[in-house]
């Protein structure tokens, strides 16, 4: 008689725990991605979603999660994976095609030598990211048109969105971030970021669980002096010392109150006048309370004892 040992019985307790935690993480990522897609109407029936696959952990996770969601979505949509081979030295051209064929996913590899352009134009020691991203974006828009893709899905996550916000805040003087969904400047393409609600730490753990064949970026990954890395370290330090702070900042990006900022294009401060009608959602904590007719009348502040009058003057200074 042959004894058959099931795969589950063959696992060690540590392996079983890792598998359990990995499956729990996968469910959480699917839930957060589904929520972002629904909140911003990222994917609709009949869409052809072009998933930009770089070979990094984020884009691998994005493709993996979207393929999983595609199987149980209440409507049909297509997925095609696209990789831009920028001819970086040491880039292994066989890894992604082999991975995608094994998954049975339609894919397209676009080969463009942007590496030579960037290294020729940008002086040594300077950051290459800006030019590289512009070149890459233009190529991907063209490929999307050629493939008939209706949505371009990028693997940016919560930390990328936060980092971009702080970069614009610190170095650009703008309260500007990285939106979960946008239309390209030429008005022809819709870009979506389904991982907008997912923290990078979860994607790191997911890549380890799934054992994605990660391809390092030798061009920008080696530029350790990037401001984005500095901002990333700041966010990590916050998460370590002040749990919840970075999430509060992230949540604030979707809870903007234009009347309490200073942008005259967002709110009409020039035409702002009292209406005599209380704002139900307003802050009335500092509104003056009308005095009772039988206890005080006009000029009550001047009739008050000296100490009390001084206190009122002090309050006016404090809250001015």
Swiss-Prot record:
Which domain of life does the protein's organism represent? Bacteria
Other remarks on this protein = The thiolation reaction likely consists of two steps: a first activation step by ATP to form an adenylated intermediate of the target base of tRNA, and a second nucleophilic substitution step of the sulfur (S) atom supplied by the hydrosulfide attached to the Fe-S cluster.
Q: What family is this?
A: Belongs to the TtcA family.
| CC cofactor note | Binds 1 [4Fe-4S] cluster per subunit. The cluster is chelated by three Cys residues, the fourth Fe has a free coordination site that may bind a sulfur atom transferred from the persulfide of IscS.
Span(s) of short sequence motif PP-loop motif = 54-59
Per its record, the protein catalyses: cytidine(32) in tRNA + S-sulfanyl-L-cysteinyl-[cysteine desulfurase] + AH2 + ATP = 2-thiocytidine(32) in tRNA + L-cysteinyl-[cysteine desulfurase] + A + AMP + diphosphate + H(+)
> Pathway, per UniProt?
tRNA modification
Report the EC code(s) recorded for this entry.
2.8.1.-
Give me the residues that bind [4Fe-4S] cluster, please. 129, 132, 220
**Would you tell me the protein name for this molecule?**
tRNA-cytidine(32) 2-sulfurtransferase
């Amino acid at each position: 008689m042959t004894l058959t040992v099931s795969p589950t019985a063959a696992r060690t307790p540590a392996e079983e725990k890792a598998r359990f935690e990995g499956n729990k993480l996968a469910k959480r990522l699917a839930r957060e991605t589904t929520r972002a897609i629904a909140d911003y109407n990222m994917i609709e029936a009949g869409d052809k979603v072009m998933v930009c696959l770089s070979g990094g952990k984020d884009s691998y996770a994005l493709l993996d999660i979207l393929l999983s969601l595609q199987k149980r979505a209440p409507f049909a949509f297509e997925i095609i994976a696209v990789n831009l081979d920028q001819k970086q030295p040491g880039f292994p051209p066989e890894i992604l095609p082999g991975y995608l064929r094994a998954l049975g996913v339609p894919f397209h590899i676009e080969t463009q030598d942007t590496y030579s352009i960037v290294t020729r134009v940008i002086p040594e020691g300077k950051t290459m990211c800006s030019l590289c991203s512009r070149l890459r974006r233009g190529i991907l828009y063209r490929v999307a048109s050629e493939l008939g893709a209706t949505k371009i899905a990028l693997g940016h996550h919560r930390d990328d969105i936060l980092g971009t916000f702080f970069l614009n805040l610190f170095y650009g003087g703008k309260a500007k971030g990285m939106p979960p969904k946008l239309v390209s400047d030429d008005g022809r393409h819709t870009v979506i970021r389904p991982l907008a609600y997912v923290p990078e730490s979860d994607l790191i753990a997911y890549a380890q669980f799934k054992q994605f064949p990660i391809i390092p970026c030798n061009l920008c990954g080696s530029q350790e002096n990037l401001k984005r890395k500095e901002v990333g370290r700041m966010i990590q330090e916050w998460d370590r010392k002040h749990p919840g702070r970075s999430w509060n900042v992230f949540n604030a990006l979707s809870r903007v109150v234009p009347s309490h900022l200073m942008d005259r294009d967002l709110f009409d401060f020039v035409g702002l006048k009292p209406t005599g009608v209380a704002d139900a959602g307003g802050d009335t904590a500092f509104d003056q309370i009308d005095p009772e007719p039988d206890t005080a009348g006009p000029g009550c502040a001047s009739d008050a004892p000296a100490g009390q009058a001084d206190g009122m003057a002090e309050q006016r200074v404090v809250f001015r």
